Amino acid sequence: MRLFCLTLLFCFVSMLYGDVMYEMVSTSEGMMGMKGETNMRIFVKGDRSLTEMTAENPMGGTMTDTKIIRLDKGVIWSIDHDNKEYTEMNIATPTQMPEEPDEEISIPDVKVMRTGETKKLLNKDCEKVIVTMDVDDDEGAMTFKQTMWVTKDIPGYKEIQDFQEHMTGTGSMSSSMMGANKKTYEEFQKKISEIEGFPLEIEMEMTMGAEGMSFSMMTHSEVTQIETKPINDKVFEIPAGYSFKK
């Protein structure tokens, strides 16, 4: 389970970007060649974000998900539009950080390489950055490679940086997901912070699991639109008439 959480965390960190609206299309291929497509629309304003996601896959059909992150309130709301309900998860702040575990957990081997290669995406000059990560523990091994094309030449880049810094300030949530102590998480985050710029295209390859029981996954994600625009504060509120689901 820790390997899976670590993968989610790493992908999440690499996509933490801010005060703009952007749309992204992701395609994935996993076990037995099964493919899927996910469309995302993300709004971010200061310390608030809304993510709308629609996923299509052969096994599960169409799935939708809406999440609101309110760093000012320290919560994440998951919105169920079909039933007009929402759930709430608290985000731990640095002052609420859990005690460090007795067992020291080793940091994964993370490498970041700026290649110097460039290409144009959305008429912006982007640089190729490759991130690799290797994890080996009781649950088995995991290898992770992520190729990103990043640029600073996008609308609202300063706001993007500010949001990322604010989000990483809630690192205790991610740290507990990893099962890592505070020092370990800080070292991990320091390595990730070497990646500058906003990724307009990402390719990810991952192999995870014990020997003889491993599976592989590949995804390709591309930003199709990005812009700065006035965003109404109501976008980041629970819709009127929705009830809390315990």
Segments (PLM) and residue ranges:
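Extended soluble regions of mature proteins
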Residues: 17-246
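Sec-dependent N-terminal signal peptides
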Residues: 3-13
